[in-house]
Amino acid sequence: MKVIFLKDVKGKGKKGEIKDVADGYANNFLFKQGLAIEATPANIKALEAQKQKEQRQAAEELANAKKLKEELEKLTVEIPAKAGEGGRLFGSITSKQIAEALQAQHGLKLDKRKIELADAIRSLGYTNVPVKLHPEVTATLKVHVKEQK
């Protein structure tokens, strides 16, 4: 019997795949557990429509990420911090502080987990910080740490 998998089933198939399985296995296990549905022409059409919808959404997310990348690369975020001799900061600037400053200064809300700061910023000056907006899109944000007076 041909079935469409609704969830990944170890050793049998992945979500969205159409496979041939034993009738008893399909009726007694896959259908009852909600892991698969019968591969009727209507269900196959619905699956194709679902896949197209997901592709459109993925393309839209990628386009939005590219647009946001262009915006971010034009901006400079300024963060005031207390510093000692030689421009070393008391404490450090974290990705959370960068995200908060970005929202306060430019009105762009960005998740701090998307800001890929290898180590916290510990000195005054300009730093280029990578921001992963999408698996395929990484922007570079300029962060200016200036001395707080």
Curated annotation (Swiss-Prot):
- At the top level, the lineage of the source is Bacteria
GO biological process terms held by the UniProt record: translation
Keyword check for Ribosomal protein = yes
PROSITE patterns in the record: RIBOSOMAL_L9
Its Gene Ontology cellular component terms are: ribonucleoprotein complex; ribosome
Q: Which Pfam families match?
A: Ribosomal_L9_C (PF03948), Ribosomal_L9_N (PF01281)
For this protein, the record's InterPro entries field holds: Ribosomal_bL9, Ribosomal_bL9/RNase_H1_N, Ribosomal_bL9_bac/chp, Ribosomal_bL9_C, Ribosomal_bL9_C_sf, Ribosomal_bL9_N, Ribosomal_bL9_N_sf
Arranged from A to Z, the UniProt key words for this protein are: Ribonucleoprotein, Ribosomal protein, RNA-binding, rRNA-binding
Q: Which GO terms describe its molecular function?
A: rRNA binding; structural constituent of ribosome
Which NCBIfam families does the UniProt entry name for this protein?
L9
Task: Spell out the family assignment given in the record's similarity comment.
Answer: Belongs to the bacterial ribosomal protein bL9 family.
Mind telling me which HAMAP family this protein's record contains?
A: Ribosomal_bL9
- What role does this protein play? Binds to the 23S rRNA.
- The protein here is known as Large ribosomal subunit protein bL9
Q: Which organism is it from?
A: Geobacillus kaustophilus (strain HTA426)
